[in-house]
């Protein structure tokens, strides 16, 4: 690995751990967190353990998607795909809106250059696929949340229609935009990359994103149970997709990420009582630690290894 890259890696890792230390030092609800751990029963610890065990499955799904996206740029095995995904977590952790995540992954390519920018565009496409799945499930949940007596069948039909549009309209739209002249080289490259996708590619990306969505939704459910949030099945079915929808569409920077997650947890769960909303806030913190701090640690350990 070139000296320049090594310096960048060291700086990124240093910034990530420095920021992590800041977040830990400034968190102001350790008393509630400690109380939850003291009061939890054995089955709640089982829920927490399963949620932690699902964290590598979560990242494996993302690595699967990343490997699929860049297969035409730099073929790699699953180990290398996971290594790049974990390292991208570090770069995303220290940049606004996680803008550095995909360029960070591409930094570990054997050859960079134009491939680096193309890979970044492909990563953005993977992010759009994940956002599509979150919206498809979150939109009906939002409708049901705002109007519980509305038609659930209509909400589901809206979700299916959105999924169909996402699958069949995106490639055709990009092919149309490709005919225009773009001043920005990055914009032109992104449109060209998306225009080269076929319907099978889009369906695969949405399928992988759906699997990952199921995994981190299960993680949230298990973490909520660990923290003592017990709701009926319908309420959980609505609250989980709604939560992920809201944190996805809310612009935020790393310094405010935990606060944004906690604020939306309060907004969603407060109708079930103050105790439930307080427990939900703790659950979002625990899940943030599982899916952000653990990948950060793994990423710093595997950054320099190439198999």
Language-model features: locations:
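Predominantly cytoplasmic-facing regulatory/coupling regions of multi-pass membrane proteins
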Residues: 1-85, 142-250, 282-284, 288-307
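Transmembrane-helix boundary and interhelical linker motifs in polytopic inner-membrane proteins
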Residues: 67-76, 101-116
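Membrane-interface alpha-helices at helix entry/exit sites of multi-pass transporters
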Residues: 79-83, 101, 112-127, 274-286
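Extended non-transmembrane interhelical loops and adjacent amphipathic helices
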Residues: 82-111
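Membrane-embedded alpha-helical segments of transport systems
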Residues: 90-96, 117-141, 246, 283-297
């Amino acid at each position: 690995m070139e000296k320049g890259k090594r310096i960048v890696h060291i700086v990124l890792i240093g910034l990530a751990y420095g920021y992590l230390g800041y977040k830990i030092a400034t968190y102001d609800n350790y008393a509630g967190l400690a109380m939850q751990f003291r009061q939890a029963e054995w089955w709640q610890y089982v829920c927490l353990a399963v949620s932690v065990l699902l964290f590598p499955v979560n990242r494996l799904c993302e690595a699967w998607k990343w490997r699929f996206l860049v297969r035409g740029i730099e073929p790699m095995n699953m180990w290398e795909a996971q290594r790049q995904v974990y390292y991208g977590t570090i770069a995303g952790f220290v940049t606004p809106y996680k803008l550095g995540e995909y360029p960070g992954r591409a930094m570990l390519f054997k050859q960079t250059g134009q491939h680096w920018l193309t890979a970044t565009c492909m990563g953005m496409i993977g992010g759009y696929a994940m956002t599509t799945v979150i919206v498809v499930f979150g939109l009906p949940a939002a409708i049901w949340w705002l109007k519980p007596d509305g038609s659930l069948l209509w909400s589901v039909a809206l979700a299916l229609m959105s999924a169909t549009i996402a699958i069949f309209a995106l490639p055709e739209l990009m092919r149309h935009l490709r005919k225009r002249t773009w001043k920005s080289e990055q914009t032109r490259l992104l449109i060209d990359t998306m225009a080269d996708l076929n319907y099978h590619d889009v369906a695969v990306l949405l399928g992988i994103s759906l699997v990952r969505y199921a995994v981190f939704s299960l993680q949230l459910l298990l973490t909520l149970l660990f923290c003592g949030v017990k709701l009926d099945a319908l309420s959980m079915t609505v609250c989980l997709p709604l939560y992920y929808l809201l944190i996805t569409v809310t612009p935020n920077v790393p310094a405010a990420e935990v606060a944004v997650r906690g604020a939306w947890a309060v907004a969603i769960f407060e109708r079930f009582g103050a105790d439930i909303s307080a427990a939900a806030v703790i659950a979002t913190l625990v899940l943030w630690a599982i899916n952000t701090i653990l990948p950060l640690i793994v990423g710093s350990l595997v950054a320099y290894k190439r198999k």
